[in-house]
Curated annotation (Swiss-Prot):
Oligomer status and interactors: Part of the 30S ribosomal subunit. Has been shown to cross-link to S19 forming a loose heterodimer. Forms two bridges to the 50S subunit in the 70S ribosome.
NCBIfam families reported for this sequence: uS13_bact (TIGR03631)
Record keywords, A-Z: Ribonucleoprotein, Ribosomal protein, RNA-binding, rRNA-binding, tRNA-binding
Name of this protein: Small ribosomal subunit protein uS13
This protein's record includes keyword rRNA-binding: yes
Protein encoded by which gene: rpsM
Known function: Located at the top of the head of the 30S subunit, it contacts several helices of the 16S rRNA. In the 70S ribosome it contacts the 23S rRNA (bridge B1a) and protein L5 of the 50S subunit (bridge B1b), connecting the 2 subunits; these bridges are implicated in subunit movement. Contacts the tRNA in the A and P-sites.
């Protein structure tokens, strides 16, 4: 397996697909192969050291893996500290982007907590 940005990428897949195993690189960003002068159809095992070096250099300029994860978590912490609506939603563990919470949002809210009925 080739290592790029501290991640082992699969050898048997095409390079454009293998790059998406790196956090922060999706299919659009994987188009950096054109800049590196590498064909998208090439398998990782067929890459030369020179081509791998060019890809590593370009990926090194991007914010990926640990740096990107750290930036995202700091952004969320900042929202929570300033007390804006999105920060409050993060703090309470509710959906942040305006989704309905009356019936759904179980992934974000966690398992149901049943409430005892009042006696009449």
């Amino acid at each position: 397996m080739a290592r790029i940005a501290g991640v082992d990428i699969p050898r048997d897949k095409r390079v454009v697909i293998s790059l998406t195993y790196i956090y922060g690189i999706g299919k659009p960003t994987a188009q950096i192969l054109k800049e590196a002068g590498v064909s998208e159809d090439t398998r990782v095992r067929d890459l030369t050291e020179e081509e791998l070096g060019r890809i590593r250099e370009i990926v090194g300029r991007l914010k990926v893996e640990g740096d990107l994860r750290r930036e995202v978590s700091l952004n969320i912490k900042r929202l929570m500290e300033i007390g804006c609506y999105r920060g409050l939603r993060h703090r309470r563990g509710l959906p942040v982007r305006g989704q309905n919470t009356k019936n759904n949002a179980r992934t974000r809210k966690g398992p149901r907590r049943t409430v005892a009925n009042k006696k009449k």
